[in-house]
């Protein structure tokens, strides 16, 4: 329950940041997502003498109809000694709390209460008429049979609508690729697995965690939440073709499409600013810096001890000028980019 509440805020950032700076103007023809067996991007290669670090760049969303062709990655994994996962934030829950069926029921009730508008209000009563009309137009276009009142707060309503629209347009999360990738990694039992993560402690009683969730949702700026809602609508209205183009580019291995676009959570992302200003995530910039430092330390160690290492990063972080690949270059490693 708490994990969902935290991720409901972060989801808006992850979902929308992938399309930041993608809009290239309106196309005369609608972009259709590619299908079939597709390889994704080539691997980046970092060299320290005879030692190699191969990096696989992930992206989300990806085309729903693609089947990831994993042979190239499978060969590298078989010949590697270690895999370094992408930087991540994880949550540490009390096992007893999660297994208690009473708490699961209480959690559903709390989640419903915190994600819905107070006093049984509806979305059209809360947001400006112009914004609601745009929301209703998108909803009617994609889901014409739905006309029941929307009682979710703007952030949640906008995020869920955007997720559903992406699925209707043939776009799905990167799990379509990362799940088979993780199966490949598990199959290679000889691999040392290095996870680079910051763990958020969510231990304690249900009451204490519920208070944290209430504080988080209560600390979100109403003005910033409306701005995030408006941005969600704008991108669903005008950038879906660009999102599909980038998803196709990733699936087919066209790396140049990603050069110069911001890392998810850039300063011009209104949903990220909403998250940053919330009480629970006030130190997110420090967390990101710590994760980057840990990943680079793991890469440095691997490049001095392993003959071959496989690593995973967001493709945007591989192609931006101040990303982790650029940091490896400043350390004097030889870089090969596709």
Regions found by a protein language model. Name each.
Residues 1-9:
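Bacterial N-terminal signal peptides that target proteins for export
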Residues 18-20:
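N-terminal signal peptide c-region/cleavage motif recognized by signal peptidases
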Residues 271-338:
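A cross-kingdom marker for long, charged
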Residues 10-15:
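Hydrophobic helical h-region of N-terminal Sec-dependent signal peptides
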